[in-house]
Amino acid sequence: DVYKRQVKNMTNKDLADLIFPNLTKTVEDYEKMYPERNLKEGAAVTRFAPSPTGYMHIGNFMSTIINYVLSKATNGVFYLRNEDTDKAREIPDAVEKIMETLEEYNLMPDEYEYQGVIVGSYGPYIQSERITIYHAYIKRLIEIGRAYPCFCTRETLDDLRKNQEEKKMRTGYYGRFAKCRNISTEEAITRIKNGEPYVIRFKSEGNPDKKFVFEDLVKGRIEFPENDQDTIIMKSDNLLPTYHFAHLVDDHLMHTTHVVRGEEWLSSVPLHLSLIHISEPTRH
């Protein structure tokens, strides 16, 4: 029938337009809105990017001091970014407590957003106010075939993991286990129009049998296997991006040059570098 013929001729762009029908700006628009910073060579742009799911702890405090000092020593910029996409765990007065702590210890950022006031030219500095930006970048990934809708249910994913564990295989959504990776555009469009819930996954091109070297400013050269996990970059319930995706877009557009964070994040480097083609890598 006519509907089937129309769906059969659909492209990745049609799929992207179906998922994001109301975006008014493109990736190119945002690249122009956030130009390179006018700083001297060697100036460090650093950030403190807490989630308002708790109060500042010693780890936060230590990384804040390092980021603050590094930016001041190089005549750079230190900014505060509120990563508030985990609304279910958000604590009402967390942002106020963070700002009070920064002010008390003379660690106030050069750029920030607080109580409706934006200080700086690279805001908004609150992630929940940047959703359309993330959507524009996810839409572009879908258009070029580097992201796709995944319709796997929680039960399906639990069964997958259980099966992998029983067979002592590496767990995750990758390769032949990435059930929705190669479904046709036509099928994806039909299932979305039928109201089937979905997330958006990044389509990785990594090979875990291959290695790459990452240059860490503290630990030096570190070798990792490439990432082949098709990681979720947009959730299904509220169309919010995941942390892994949102912070990369932000660091790119805000022109962050150095990231100081805990060692527990080292294992995420392969994933972040596989996503980094949307931006330029920052230094860690």
Regions found by a protein language model. Give the residues of each.
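N-terminal Rossmann-like or analogous alpha/beta NTP/dinucleotide-binding catalytic cores
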Residues: 8-166, 237, 267-279, 283
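Active-site cores that bind ATP or allylic diphosphates and position pyrophosphate for catalysis
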Residues: 140-279, 283
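Active-site loops and adjacent core secondary-structure elements that bind or stabilize anionic groups
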Residues: 2
